[in-house]
């Protein structure tokens, strides 16, 4: 029947699916696009709006024009009316009824749509028109079953012929541009993949692609005749699968290329793409494919990865059309070096490059010709060029104004303050007015790198505000005379004109050669006038000096040279005794031996000259001030870590770990001045013992040297003078060089142990200067420590700060100073001392390597737990032990105080008050910036909460510390805090500032005008005392309030804590600063003694 002819479509998909033999289900047919593939004149639709006239035609009779353009074939697409878009399905066709009947049934069922289920009217059959004309005639004779035999033969060869024909199509150079267009068109069918595979628009587009390729092999499967419904359905599945594979392959190629166009291009930079090889200019896939490289010559070469914006998009797709579908994956990277195979899938093709990374260009720069050429200079901008006779402006086109600015800034830097403070070479080249030759500046390498033109340098510096040019010389405009330095004196070149008067210059052996003197009496030699050329040349010599040798040893020559002082390192010896020793040698020695001995003596002097220079450097300290302005009274952070705090353990901590709740504080012993001095000396000796342990290896070395010297034989004084001659005298030196005393050995006891007896012996006096004369590192009574040598007397730096003032009964009627100690609830002050350990105790850090510094282990464990003082040889040890003194490492004691302050609250920690007191005393003699900043911060924080003991300790440090060592920055802080304290209603800071101005030796101080106004109200020290307020009782305890404000707090202080605020602050607020300060704040008790008004 005619209905069984139509099931196979050219696109490999069917519109009619057989449910049973002769029964067809018609699917949704979209409207057919118009264009190149429109049907021919025999088409069923033919542009007629009514499909009823064409009912005799089969449903699949839509003609389709093939790629060659001269043949037509009908597509099995059903006819439908224009604009009809609903699905037309016919279920009831059986056996292929008559044409008219079938069309009527379809029209009734379709509701406006035509379902062509009639038998085929095969007037023009596109399936057999082109390939097999006999089949076409058979179809025209309306005997469709005869088409099955030739169709089977052609269908069997379809897959092989398509594969072969596609390879042949790619090899056709004439039709090459057509696949590129097809690749762009094939993106549209890709979007229809999720839709049902039996829709016609994707299939028609695929037919147009096949038609554009001109493959005649696609027509061969369409020449098949339909056998039966089952056979044609099987044929449909086979061709549909083949068309899907082919269609998917066409869709795959452009999609992959568009998404990953640059991944393989970055890896194609290999040695064949170097600039000197123009035959590899087209570095594209044509090189890798190798077979059609001729077609890629006009294509622009791809740019490297670092120039993606110059990539030609159209040429990119054309290049990749010849590559394999999946060779742009991993295989493209591997076969990029020399591979020329197809590289299908993820293989590496036939290339031998493998995973070749470009060792020639480690950064992946692939090409340096074409557009990359102008970019190459940017990789050499960091190179500094030095020119001989060529200016940089001749090599590079630099703006002249910009170049002048560079030159000006470079030379202005040379004359800047920061550079001149370090550039001693430049300052030594300056003349007295600070000028430097412009040629010297132009000879510097950095200036030469800019220009070698002197005139350009003049032009650049013409408008400079830092330097000025005068007569081809340049100097700094501001204070040019302060920078020149005197040039270094070169002592290597001897001025022989100054040596004419030196005895070493006179050829003594010449005189002795002509003078026959007696061997035993050199002074009695009768001088013989010399008449040689050597003597005649010495016309400038004094008369006596050129006459005879004895005149060389006369005292008159020494007086002329004005060098009567010998080196202090040895006993004084006159020049006469020295030269008499030289002339007392046996006279029978030849003159050559005397000459060689003079040369040996000179070499000996030269050998000792380095040692004398070291001694001379040490001697300079004796000509300068003993105290250094910068380092005096200062201590660095490393020495702070060596401090051991010696303080009393509170009585309540010793007996009651939970705290003393009785209020009976009698643990502090009354400290007299004599007892304090004994303890202070004891701490000195304890410190001496700590350092003696450190220097023990040094003592052993000295003892070994002494033992070695004891093995030396005794010699006479003359022989010793011969072995150790005097150093040469420099005539240009105004101050004679001389070594200072050598470092002294620690103690007398150690000296007795090393040298055997305390009194100096003759052998000790005859030792060289490398052995100390006096076995004392420190003085006998006051040992010196690492910081005390900077002071004139180490005994001035006290080690113990006792509390010597006794508390007295408060008198409510007597005026008093504004001080917490005079309040009704004074703080309990404690004795505190310190020693400097020989090794550093670093604070605990997160680093494992931050262990305590090297050295011998100190006695005891310096943990947070107080440790008793170890035994040392001094009576004060028992005193310290009986009074409960313990030692702590400074940073651990500080941490414990801060923890207690945090735990108990501000102003409630007795240990914190002790730390405040230690800071106030210690910083006066050993200033440390970090310690001072912490002291100030914590004291101000306590004062804000109403606890003023720390602030009072700070003011005491200001007053006494600045009086001992004035520091401008500390003085500014003193003024600032004094103004704040007075404006808060307090008088203690102003009193300490008034005392500093009265007793300090500093003059011409710049004082704040506001502070001067406040000081004008107080003429004497008694003016700072205030009367207690009415109704205040001496034994009445007050609650603390914040300084400067009224209103008390309900917090009650522990009896042992310091009062941050004076008592009786609740009754009335402080008087404003502008008023009379006498009635400001009556919270102070009476002053117990006039002698202690400025006390601590």
Curated annotation (Swiss-Prot):
Biased composition (Gly residues): 97-110
Bias (Low complexity) ranges: 150-159, 580-596, 775-789
Annotated region (Required for interaction with PABPC1), positions in chain: 77-573
Glycyl lysine isopeptide (Lys-Gly) (interchain with G-Cter in SUMO2) crosslink, residue number(s): 260, 311, 531, 703
Recorded consequence of changing residue 917 to E: Abolishes RNA binding. Abolishes inhibition of EIF4G1 binding to mRNA molecules with a 5'TOP motif
Expression induction or repression: Up-regulated in a number of hepatocellular carcinoma cell lines and liver cancer lesions, as well as in patients with hepatocellular carcinoma with a lower survival rate (at protein level).
Segments for region (Disordered): 1-356, 511-598, 759-861, 1026-1096
Ranges for region Interaction with 7-methylguanosine mRNA cap structure: 956-999
Cellular localization per UniProt: Cytoplasm; Cytoplasmic granule
Region (Required for interaction with RPTOR and for repression of mRNAs with a 5'TOP motif): 574-1096
Phosphoserine modified-residue sites: 75, 90, 143, 165, 215, 220, 225, 228, 324, 327, 517, 521, 548, 591, 627, 631, 766, 774, 824, 847, 851, 853, 861, 868, 1040, 1058, 1089
Regions of compositional bias (Polar residues) in chain numbering: 763-773, 846-861, 1084-1096
Outcome of substituting residue 960 to A: Abolishes RNA binding. Abolishes translational repression of mRNAs with a 5'TOP motif. Abolishes inhibition of EIF4G1 binding to mRNA molecules with a 5'TOP motif
Biased composition regions of type Basic and acidic residues, renumbered to the chain: 63-76, 202-239, 259-290, 310-320, 805-814
Pfam families: La, LARP1_HEAT
Effect of residue 1058 to A: Strongly reduced phosphorylation mediated by AKT and RPS6KB1. Decreased interaction with RPTOR and impaired dissociation from the 5'UTR of mRNA molecules
An annotated Gene Ontology molecular function: mRNA 3'-UTR binding
PTM info: Phosphorylated on multiple Ser and Thr residues in response to active mTORC1. Phosphorylation is important for interaction with RPTOR and the mTORC1 complex. Phosphorylation promotes dissociation from the 5'UTR of mRNA molecules with a 5'TOP motif.
Entry keyword annotation includes Transcription regulation: no
Keywords assigned: Acetylation, Cytoplasm, Isopeptide bond, Methylation, Phosphoprotein, Protein biosynthesis, Repressor, RNA-binding, Translation regulation, Ubl conjugation
PTM annotation (N-acetylalanine): residues: 2
UniProt domain HTH La-type RNA-binding: residue ranges: 397-487
Result when mutating residue 999 to A: Strongly decreased RNA binding
Complex formation: Interacts with PABPC1/PABP. Interacts with EIF4A1. Interacts with RPTOR. Recruited to the active mTORC1 complex via interaction with RPTOR. Inhibition of mTORC1 activity strongly reduces interaction with RPTOR and the mTORC1 complex. Identified in a complex with mRNA, PABPC1, EIF4E and EIF4G1. Found in a complex with PABPC1 and SHFL.
Similarity remark: Belongs to the LARP family.
Stated name of the protein: La-related protein 1
Biological source species: Homo sapiens (Human)
Highest classification ranks of the organism: Eukaryota, Metazoa, Chordata, Craniata, Vertebrata
């Amino acid at each position: 029947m005619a209905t069984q002819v139509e099931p196979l479509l050219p696109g490999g998909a069917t519109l009619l699916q057989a449910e049973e033999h002769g029964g067809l289900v018609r699917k949704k047919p979209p409207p057919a696009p118009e264009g190149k593939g429109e049907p021919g004149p025999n088409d069923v639709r033919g542009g007629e709006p009514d499909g009823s006239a064409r009912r005799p035609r089969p449903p699949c009779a839509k003609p389709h024009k093939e790629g060659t353009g001269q043949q037509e074939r009908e597509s099995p697409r059903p006819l439908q009316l224009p604009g009809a878009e609903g699905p037309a399905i016919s279920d009831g066709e059986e056996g292929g009824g008559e044409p008219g009947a079938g069309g009527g049934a379809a029209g009734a069922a379709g509701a406006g749509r035509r379902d062509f289920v009639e038998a085929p009217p095969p007037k023009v059959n596109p399936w057999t028109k082109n390939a097999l004309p006999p089949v076409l005639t058979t179809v025209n004779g309306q005997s469709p079953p005869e088409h099955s035999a030739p169709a089977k033969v052609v269908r069997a060869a379809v897959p092989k012929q398509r594969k072969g024909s596609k390879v042949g199509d790619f090899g056709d150079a004439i039709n090459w541009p057509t696949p590129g267009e097809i690749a762009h068109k094939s993106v549209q069918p890709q979007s229809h993949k999720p839709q049902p595979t039996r829709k016609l628009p994707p299939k028609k587009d695929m037919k147009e692609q096949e038609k554009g390729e001109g493959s005649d092999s696609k027509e061969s499967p369409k020449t098949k005749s339909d056998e039966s419904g089952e056979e044609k359905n099987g044929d449909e599945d086979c061709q549909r699968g083949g068309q899907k594979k082919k269609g998917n392959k066409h869709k795959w190629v452009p999609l992959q290329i568009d998404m990953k166009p640059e991944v393989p291009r970055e890896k194609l930079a290999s040695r064949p793409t170097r600039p000197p090889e123009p035959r590899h200019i087209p570095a594209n896939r044509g090189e890798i494919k190798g077979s059609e490289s001729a077609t890629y010559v006009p294509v622009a070469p791809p740019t490297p990865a670092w120039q993606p914006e110059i990539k030609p998009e159209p040429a990119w797709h054309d290049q990749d059309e010849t590559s394999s579908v999946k060779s742009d994956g991993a295989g493209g990277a591997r076969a990029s070096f020399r591979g020329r195979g197809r590289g299908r899938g993820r293989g590496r093709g036939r290339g031998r490059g493998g995973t070749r990374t470009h060792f020639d260009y480690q950064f992946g720069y692939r090409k340096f010709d074409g557009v990359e050429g102008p970019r190459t200079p940017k990789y050499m901008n960091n190179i500094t060029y030095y020119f001989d006779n060529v200016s940089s402006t001749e090599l590079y086109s630099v703006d002249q104004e910009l170049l002048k600015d560079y030159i000006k800034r470079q030379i202005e830097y040379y004359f800047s303050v920061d550079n001149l403070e370090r550039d001693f070479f430049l300052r030594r080249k300056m003349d007295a007015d600070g000028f430097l030759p412009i040629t010297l500046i132009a000879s510097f390498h950095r200036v030469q790198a800019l220009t070698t033109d002197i005139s350009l340098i003049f032009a650049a510096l013409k408008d400079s505000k830092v330097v000025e040019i005068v007569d081809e010389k340049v100097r700094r405009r501001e204070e040019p005379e302060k920078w020149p330095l005197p040039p270094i004196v070169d002592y290597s070149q001897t001025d022989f004109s100054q040596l004419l008067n030196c005895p070493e210059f006179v050829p003594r052996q010449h005189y002795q050669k002509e003078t026959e003197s007696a061997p035993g009496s050199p002074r009695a030699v009768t001088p013989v006038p010399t008449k040689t050329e050597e003597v005649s040349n010495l016309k400038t010599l004094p008369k006596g000096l050129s006459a005879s040798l004895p005149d060389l040893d006369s005292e008159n020559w020494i007086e002329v040279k004005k060098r009567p002082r010998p080196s202090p390192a040895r006993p004084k010896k006159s020049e006469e005794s020295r030269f008499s020793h030289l002339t007392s040698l046996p006279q029978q020695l030849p003159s050559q031996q005397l000459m060689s001995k003079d040369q040996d003596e000179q070499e000996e002097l030269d050998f000792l000259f380095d040692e004398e220079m070291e001694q001379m450097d040490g001697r300079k300290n004796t000509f300068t001030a003993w105290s250094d302005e910068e380092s005096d009274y200062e201590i660095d952070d490393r020495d702070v870590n060596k401090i051991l705090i010696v303080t009393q353990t509170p009585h309540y901590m010793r007996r009651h770990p939970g705290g003393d709740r009785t209020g009976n504080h009698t643990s502090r012993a009354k400290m007299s001045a004599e007892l304090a001095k004994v303890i202070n000396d004891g701490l000195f000796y304890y410190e001496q013992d700590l350092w003696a342990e450190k220097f023990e290896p040094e003592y052993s070395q000295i003892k070994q040297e002494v033992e070695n010297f004891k093995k030396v034989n005794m010699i006479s004084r003359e022989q010793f003078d011969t072995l150790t001659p005097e150093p040469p005298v420099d005539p240009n030196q105004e101050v004679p060089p001389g070594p200072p005393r050598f470092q002294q050995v620690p103690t007398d006891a150690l000296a007795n142990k090393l040298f055997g007896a305390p009194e100096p012996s003759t052998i000790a006096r005859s030792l060289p200067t490398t052995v100390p004369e006096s076995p004392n590192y420190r003085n006998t009574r006051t040992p010196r420590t690492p910081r005390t040598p900077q002071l004139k007397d180490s005994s001035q730096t006290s080690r113990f700060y006792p509390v010597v003032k006794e508390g007295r009964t408060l008198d409510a009627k007597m005026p008093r100073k504004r001080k917490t100690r005079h309040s009704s609830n004074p703080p309990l002050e404690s004795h505190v001392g310190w020693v400097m350990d020989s090794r550093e105790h670093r604070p605990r850090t997160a680093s494992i390597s931050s262990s305590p510094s090297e050295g011998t282990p100190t006695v005891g464990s310096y943990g947070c737990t107080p440790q008793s003082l170890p035994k040392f040889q001094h009576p004060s040890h028992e005193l310290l032990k009986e009074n409960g003194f313990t030692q702590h490492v400074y940073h651990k004691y500080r941490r414990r105080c801060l923890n207690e302050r945090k735990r108990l609250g501000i102003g409630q920690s007795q240990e914190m008050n002790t730390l405040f007191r230690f800071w106030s005393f210690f910083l006066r003699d050993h200033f440390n910036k970090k310690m001072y900043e912490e002291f100030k911060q914590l004291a101000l924080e306590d004062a804000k909460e109403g606890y003023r003991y720390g602030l009072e300790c700070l003011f005491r440090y200001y007053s006494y510390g600045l009086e001992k060592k004035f520091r401008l920055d500390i003085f500014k802080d003193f003024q600032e805090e004094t103004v704040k304290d007075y404006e808060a209603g307090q008088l203690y800071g102003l009193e300490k500032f008034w005392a500093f101005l009265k007793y300090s030796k500093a003059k011409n101080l710049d004082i704040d005008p506001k502070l001067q106004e406040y000081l004008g109200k107080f003429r004497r020290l008694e003016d700072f005392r205030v009367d207690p307020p009415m109704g205040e009782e001496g034994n009445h305890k007050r609650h603390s309030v914040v300084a400067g404000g009224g209103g008390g707090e309900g917090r009650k202080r522990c009896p042992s804590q310091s009062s941050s605020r004076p008592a009786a602050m609740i009754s009335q607020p402080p008087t404003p600063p502008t008023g009379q300060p006498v009635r400001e704040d009556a919270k102070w008790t009476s002053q117990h003694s006039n002698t202690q008004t400025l006390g601590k």
